[in-house]
Amino acid sequence: MFMTESRLTHLKQLEAESIHIIREVAAEFENPVMLYSIGKDSAVMLHLALKAFYPAKLPFPLLHVDTGWKFKDMIAFRDNMAKTHGFDLIVHQNKEGREAGINPFDHGSSKYTDIMKTQALKQALDKYQFDAAFGGARRDEEKSRAKERVYSFRDSKHRWDPKNQRPELWNLYNGKVNKGESIRVFPLSNWTELDIWQYIYLENIQIVPLYFSAVRPVVERSGTLIMVDDERMRLKEGEVPQMKSVRFRTLGCYPLTGAVESEADTLPEIIQEMLLATSSERQGRMIDHDEAGSMEKKKQEGYF
């Protein structure tokens, strides 16, 4: 007897939908890749992909765009996951940007993000000629992502046109692309932040320790707590790091990622926090505060 969709829990329905999308892409495209940002959404997406093809290995590689400014714990976690699961991991960095010394302090978050993230991603997609790329974005994160399709068409310059999106009826997706064009695929589109945390708890998925509360050195800038992760952190005159009990709801480059004061050091406690949260997790992403509509503008330029 087959289990109908109506008999599945909402998390199992989301899981089934995501696995269907991942398998569809693997079957439909010649050279797909999974973007691996090392965050909680990437952890769930990787877990779903491993489930989708178990006991076989993943039929596509993982790509991490390394800006050089990720948290140390993130890089250690990435390398450990690759070793544990044996997947093919591609690490790409914008060599020209690195040699030019592009950093979030001297060049600002907008220019830094464009060069070390957007341009680096486009370089990697062109270099390896990927025709589809999985990403862990969700529609509840931010308004420009809310209107993006599961299969997000990108032209030969990796640009997204929000006014020219393909219809998606039921679970049917149009993956037709010409040479040089590509599709960004978002299997977690219909998940919420709370869904992600509940699934991590139920499936016992490994995540970066930074998501759990611990006493860490931070400085407060414009109301945002920035963790001092290494000696490259530039302190302003008179600024002294304070030890506070904090955790992160979202992860990125450490000088541009805000922590939240919290005592939640277990998954049930994090889930309880999510039930009471009144702001988006991306409030902690300083790159989203550059200008009005900045995320949509970044996506039109090729950002994920």
Curated annotation (Swiss-Prot):
Reaction(s) the record says it catalyses: sulfate + ATP + H(+) = adenosine 5'-phosphosulfate + diphosphate
Entry GO MF terms: ATP binding; sulfate adenylyltransferase (ATP) activity
Biological processes per GO annotation: hydrogen sulfide biosynthetic process; sulfate assimilation
Pfam families: PAPS_reduct
Pathway: Sulfur metabolism; hydrogen sulfide biosynthesis; sulfite from sulfate: step 1/3
UniProt keyword Nucleotide-binding present: yes
EC number in record: 2.7.7.4
The entry's keywords: ATP-binding, Nucleotide-binding, Nucleotidyltransferase, Transferase
Keyword set includes Nucleotide-binding: yes
Enzyme class at the top of the EC tree: transferase
Role this protein plays: With CysN forms the ATP sulfurylase (ATPS) that catalyzes the adenylation of sulfate producing adenosine 5'-phosphosulfate (APS) and diphosphate, the first enzymatic step in sulfur assimilation pathway. APS synthesis involves the formation of a high-energy phosphoric-sulfuric acid anhydride bond driven by GTP hydrolysis by CysN coupled to ATP hydrolysis by CysD.
Family membership noted in the UniProt record: Belongs to the PAPS reductase family. CysD subfamily.
Subunit structure comment from the entry: Heterodimer composed of CysD, the smaller subunit, and CysN.
This protein's name: Sulfate adenylyltransferase subunit 2
Organism: Acinetobacter baumannii (strain AYE)
GN (gene name): cysD
